[in-house]
């Protein structure tokens, strides 16, 4: 099932405000100054598709695997949807190329998948939120219901928690990533890019209060120094675990990221 969708600059700006996403590739003013299009956040695309999937199937899914293979810009029509093959629901966002696939793998949503064993340690980063953020998020992602929307919001908000950990490092690995991404220190000018994200939904009934704190227990591990890292994240609110997730991040040159983005 697919929809033709077009995301405007204002939608992206409001989504980033709600999720505290300050990545400059989503900033119209900055990107236009570079004669580049504005990149639509992957979590905006993902959340929109998942709402569509749940609205169509009315099923509960506990496993989400995202593959990030491309970027999509605002003000361009996108084929957005999912393709069901047996127990697997493949997600896609296509505008010439699919954002959610590579030559070797595709983003998929499934149910009844066993959880992985997670490291019990990690450092908790707290992220405050308020009602306006949730309402904006629900509106922009065409929310199916509040419970699903809260789950998706906590995923989108996790990016801000990860970058908070990097900007305010505590562990040796966090300090290493901080130095790598600090453009005042590292002349190579690199930025983090998600390669994959696996999410194991723990509680299908967990909901956010109107305002409060979301706790993200984060553990960074080095896969290849100054290149590739893995982050394990557990998301908790009001003593309820929403999900556990595994990110694989790679540091790539800013120039390469900009080459992936269409010219205006």
Regions found by a protein language model. Give the residues of each.
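HotDog/MaoC-like acyl-thioester-processing domains
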Residues: 1-3, 58-63, 67-133, 201-264
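General "foldedness" signal
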Residues: 21, 26-29, 53, 57, ...
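Extended, compositionally biased flexible segments
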Residues: 34-74, 174-198
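A generic structural micro-environment signature
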Residues: 13, 18-21, 31-32, 45-46, ...
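Acidic/His-leaning functional-site neighborhoods
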Residues: 16, 20-26, 45, 147-228, ...
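Catalytic strand-loop segment that frames the active site of acyl-thioester-processing enzymes
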Residues: 1-38, 110-172
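Hydrophobic, Leu/Ile/Phe/Ala-enriched alpha-helical segments that form helix-helix packing faces
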Residues: 49-57, 82, 141, 158-166, ...
């Amino acid at each position: 099932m697919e929809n033709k969708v077009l995301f405007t600059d204002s939608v992206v700006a409001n989504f980033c405000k709600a999720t505290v996403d300050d990545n400059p590739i989503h900033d119209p003013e900055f990107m236009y100054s570079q004669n580049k299009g504005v990149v639509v956040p992957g979590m905006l695309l993902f959340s929109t598709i998942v709402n569509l999937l749940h609205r169509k199937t009315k099923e509960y899914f506990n496993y989400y695997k995202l593959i990030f293979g491309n970027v999509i810009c605002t003000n361009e029509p996108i084929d957005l949807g999912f393709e069901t093959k047996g127990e697997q629901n493949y997600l896609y966002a296509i505008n010439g190329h699919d954002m959610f696939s590579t030559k070797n793998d595709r983003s998929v949503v499934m149910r009844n998948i066993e959880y992985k064993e997670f490291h019990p340690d990690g450092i908790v980063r707290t992220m405050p939120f308020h009602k306006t953020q949730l309402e904006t998020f629900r509106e922009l992602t065409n929310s199916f219901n509040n419970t699903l929307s809260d789950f998706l919001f906590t995923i989108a908000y996790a990016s801000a928690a990860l970058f908070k950990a990097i900007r305010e490092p505590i562990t040796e690995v966090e300090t290493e990533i901080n130095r790598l991404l600090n453009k005042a220190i590292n002349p190579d000018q690199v930025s983090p890019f998600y390669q994959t994200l696996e999410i194991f939904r723990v509680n299908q009934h967990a909901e956010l209060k109107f305002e409060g704190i979301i706790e993200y227990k984060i553990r960074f591990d080095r896969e290849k120094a100054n290149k590739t890292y893995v982050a394990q994240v557990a998301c908790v609110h009001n003593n309820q675990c929403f999900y556990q997730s595994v990110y694989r991040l790679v540091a790539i040159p800013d120039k390469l990221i900009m080459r992936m983005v269409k010219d205006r």
